[in-house]
Amino acid sequence: MVVTNSCAPDPRVLRSAFWLSEAGHQVTVHAFDRLQLHAKSESLHGARIMRYHLGDIPYGGMLKSIRGIMQFSKRVKATLLHSPPELIYCHDADTLSIAVSLKKSHGIPFVFDMHDLHHTWIRMPAPKSILRKLLSRKMESTMIRHAGKADAIITTSGKIEGGIHDGFEQYLQSKNLASIVVENRPIEMSIPQQRNPENKDWTVGYLGRVRELKTFTLMLEAIKLIPTTERPKLIIAGDGIRENEVRELMLNAIESDGIEADVSGAFTPDQFQELVKQLDVMFAIYPPERGNILQGALPVKMFDAAANGVPSVVNSGCLMGEIAEAEEIGKAVAWNDAQAACDALLELRNKTVELTITSQREKEKFLSTVLPLID
């Protein structure tokens, strides 16, 4: 398996590695530790994680990131050539060039797992930038060409039965690429605690990658519409390219508006469990300008929160909102509507939800797709 993050952790990568290991296969995850923060070698969930340290290459720097990924790809390719695997599993589009090259030279089959529309990420810092728009189109074209060479394609979302909103499966279909949907549903479920309707102390959280400032600006706008004595505490946890800006935004809100907030960085799976148990509502509303939200992105935090009984506020007018309301695990509201977000938070504050569709369904689809390529 190849992934361009440090896999410390990456739940989808580790879940797929665990399923293959459980099925009797040896799995090595080749991960790019850009900030060189984690052990170079680690065993986790039955898989070996090899982390490549290639100098400090921070997230967000476009040219540095491109050069770093090219260097990482070259190193991984050399490692795999030294001891060729039976199968290469590509997590996201920025790892495809490795598998395409080795399939051409050594006939090694590969799976493309499209977590997200990777070409939309480059537009995140400046959605109106013409240069970033052109680069995004080039990345998309390359991804489609490489994906066509895959022996199987797996993705994270698809239109639900009787639904109206498309997912990534439909995006791939529009490019004449067939795929299997394996959603990011957690393996472990917690027994949810019933909320106390008389309890005035409550907490709203955001746990995950901190990629966009606008999500947190909207969160604060919604919270400020709640009377001061009834406002929730905020818990923000996660790392990403906007981490420092979000921290500063929250510190200003604490000082100027009396908002109560805890802000922290990256967390482990165990720490996530401790954090999510403190929440009453998960905030998972994203700016739709970059494209992947309206095309079917499903926030992992929505499923992880529901597995712990916590409802989420998510975007309306897209697949995530449709699933949240169909499965009764959250409330969908329009982007940039602070009043609607405020109303949804208040509506959900004492609600306990249950995630009835778990990863078992996803595991069966995953194994039926991947195992025929190696067994």
Task: List the model feature ranges, each with a label.
Residues 154, 186-188, 196-224, 235:
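Conserved donor-binding/catalytic core segment of Leloir-type glycosyltransferases
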Residues 1-37, 42, 152, 158, ...:
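N-terminal subdomain of nucleotide-sugar transferases
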Residues 137-179, 186-188:
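A short, active-site helix/loop in glycosyltransferases that binds the activated sugar's phosphate group
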Residues 326-327, 331-338, 346-349:
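Conserved acidic donor-binding segment of nucleotide-sugar-dependent glycosyltransferases
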Residues 281-284, 304-314:
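Short hydrophobic beta-strand element within catalytic cores of glycosyltransferases
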Residues 247-276, 281:
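Nucleotide-activated donor-binding/catalytic signature segment of Leloir-type glycosyltransferases, i.e.
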Residues 74-81, 97, 101-105, 118-119, ...:
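Membrane-proximal helix-turn-helix segments that form the acceptor-binding/catalytic region
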Residues 336-340, 349-375:
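A charged, aromatic-enriched C-terminal amphipathic alpha-helix characteristic of glycosyltransferases
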